[in-house]
């Protein structure tokens, strides 16, 4: 029979202290936590959880209760049993804000929990958007005011347990062009249409962007780093092999499934205290690094 890995938690809990990591205290972005919207009016904020406190995401959600906020949009995927961010959405709706949530009911293993949250959200007056044909895996939170808006885009789930144990990026911004894109994404979801975006990418658009970027690096001075949980897309793997064969340095950080290896490609799996969860792709592009973040793994079903 397969090994029951849940027993490892019990084993470590009952074992000697040297089996356990010392207490961990994340860095707290104090200025952001004090007034996230005020700081975002001045500059963008990029955090890497859990080294930088996931509480920043929950504090951003609580900013939806501010007087100047008129409307809130959010995606919820793996909610968990207790979720301050979801509670903030409920509180905002009860305070009279227009709150719209895309609650993905097909998150594997969390279907019943998400159904419970669905009932709570609806009772509070939140508009829960109809599920589109395709699973929505994007992690986006949008706050709209009379003057403009603020957006959060992340690689991780809006889930406090995950937020303290998974490595993930969070980008917070008030840039008008990004806010407009996130708003267009949510509007398309509400109207059950395919999003037409310029800055952001979804589905097949992610694959096209990655393929173009990889092939652009297919020369002796090329340099690229890809980090995913799963890297199984045949087209992308073929492009990586081609770039490496043309002399590019290709580094892969893949936590779980990698379906093709090549002598010219460096591939590693990071195993440590936290679960590697951030997905990122970096390309040097002639000296200037371009970095893309995504919540999606490089798998055919996701593209």
How would you label these PLM feature ranges?
Residues 225:
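Catalytic grooves of carbohydrate-active enzymes
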Residues 233:
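Glycine-rich phosphate-binding loops at beta-strand->alpha-helix junctions
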Residues 249-253:
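Hydrophobic alpha/beta core scaffold segments
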């Amino acid at each position: 029979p397969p090994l029951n890995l849940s027993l490892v938690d019990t084993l470590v809990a009952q074992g000697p202290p040297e089996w356990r990591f010392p207490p961990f205290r994340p860095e707290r972005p104090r200025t952001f936590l004090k007034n996230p919207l005020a700081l975002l009016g001045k500059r963008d904020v990029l955090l890497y959880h859990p080294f930088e406190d996931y509480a920043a995401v929950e504090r951003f959600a609580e900013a939806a209760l501010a007087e100047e906020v008129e409307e809130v949009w959010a995606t919820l995927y793996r909610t968990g049993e207790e979720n301050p961010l979801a509670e903030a959405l409920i509180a905002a709706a009860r305070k009279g804000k227009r709150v719209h949530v895309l609650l993905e009911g097909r998150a594997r293993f969390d279907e019943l929990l998400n159904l419970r949250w669905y009932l709570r959200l609806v009772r509070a007056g939140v508009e829960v958007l109809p599920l589109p044909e395709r699973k929505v895996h994007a992690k986006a939170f949008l706050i709209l005011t009379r003057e403009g808006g603020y957006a959060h885009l992340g690689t991780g789930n809006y889930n406090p347990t995950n937020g303290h144990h998974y490595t993930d990026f969070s980008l917070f911004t008030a840039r008008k062009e990004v806010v407009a894109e996130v708003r267009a994404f949510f509007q398309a979801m509400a109207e059950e249409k395919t999003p037409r975006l310029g800055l952001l990418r979804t589905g097949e658009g992610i694959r096209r962007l990655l393929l173009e970027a990889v092939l652009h690096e297919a020369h002796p001075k090329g340099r690229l780093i890809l980090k995913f949980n799963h890297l199984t897309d045949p087209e992308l793997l073929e492009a990586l092999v081609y770039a490496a064969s043309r002399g590019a340095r290709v580094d892969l950080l893949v936590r779980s499934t990698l379906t093709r290896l090549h002598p010219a490609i460096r591939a590693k799996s990071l195993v440590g205290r936290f679960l590697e969860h951030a997905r990122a792709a970096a390309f040097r592009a002639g000296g200037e690094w371009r970095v893309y973040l995504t919540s999606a793994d490089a798998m055919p079903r996701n593209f």
